[in-house]
Amino acid sequence: MTLTDSDKAAVVALWGKIAPQANAIGAEALERLFLSYPQTKTYFSHFDLSHGSADLANHGGKVVNALGEAAKHIDDLDAALSTLSDLHAYNLRVDPGNFKLLSHTIQVTLAIHFHKEFDAATQAAWDKFLAEVATVLTSKYR
């Protein structure tokens, strides 16, 4: 799936609105992930996963800010995400299917927070962008 110029513009434009709320949006997306797909909690046994926890806000912020870095380097996702790809493939060994689940909960969260901006074209662009990110993050899996 190749991102068009209009897809890239939509991702970058919405990122500008997401950035100031990165921790809150990330925490909400993770909380939604854990509620909808409880099996994903296994990677976070050392976290406080309760609503409003600092762990959710901190890690959610890391996830969303990593997407921001990807958006800033949207034409070279491989280089921008290389370190994270190594981390997820070799150290964390996250089930690759979980990236699709997280992609879904991120999109739901974005739709709730940015209902006017997150129209069909923007949602399609973010869906493609998150799929590209997931492809890069799982590219080093064996």
Swiss-Prot record:
Gene3D superfamilies xref list: Globins
Free-text tissue specificity from the UniProt record: Red blood cells.
Gene Ontology terms: cellular component: blood microparticle; haptoglobin-hemoglobin complex; hemoglobin complex
Positions of transmembrane segments: none
UniProt GO molecular function: haptoglobin binding; heme binding; iron ion binding; organic acid binding; oxygen binding; oxygen carrier activity; peroxidase activity
Domain annotation Globin: ranges: 2-142
A Pfam cross-reference name: Globin
Annotated binding of heme b, by residue: H88
GO biological processes: hydrogen peroxide catabolic process
Amino acids binding O2: H59
InterPro entries in UniProt: Globin, Globin-like_sf, Globin/Proto, Hemoglobin_a-typ, Hemoglobin_oxygen_transport, Hemoglobin_pi
Key words of the record: Heme, Iron, Metal-binding, Oxygen transport, Transport
Biological role stated in the UniProt entry: This is a larval (tadpole) alpha-globin.
Assigned protein family: Belongs to the globin family.
Subunit and partners: Heterotetramer of two alpha chains and two beta chains.
The name this protein goes by in its record: Hemoglobin subunit alpha-3
Lineage: Eukaryota, Metazoa, Chordata, Craniata, Vertebrata
